[in-house]
Amino acid sequence: MASREVLVVEDDTDLRESLSQALRDHGFGVTPATNGQEALDLLHAGARPSVILLDLMMPGLNGWQLRAALRRDPGLARIPQVVISAYMDEAEQAVLALPPDDCLRKPFHIRILIDALERHCQPLPQT
């Protein structure tokens, strides 16, 4: 994947599609996933985004569970994570439990998201 590739993990179809389009408009490559399990499957199949943008509240494998699974896998643990959440309490719990690289509260301005993603879009070293 390109060094500006984002794995967008969001269960809300409209938000996932609008985020994906906004990121593409800003020069990012995008791989969408509807939940944590789909994201994990993509990663286990070899997807290597430079950053993961994920919601916490999703059906099935949620954002917390995905983050824990990523942490347990040495090959995936180093991929930066930007958490998005509609609930600040939820986001604060995530930060305290397992600090992400960035955390944004929904709704957010797209420029703030782009800035956060660009901070973390460095190519990962090859293993």
Locate each region found by the language model.
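Conserved acidic carboxylate
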Residues: E10
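Charged docking surfaces used in two-component/phosphorelay signaling
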Residues: E17-D25
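Receiver (REC) domain active-site loop signature in two-component systems and cognate sites
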Residues: M58
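C-terminal output helix
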Residues: F108-C121
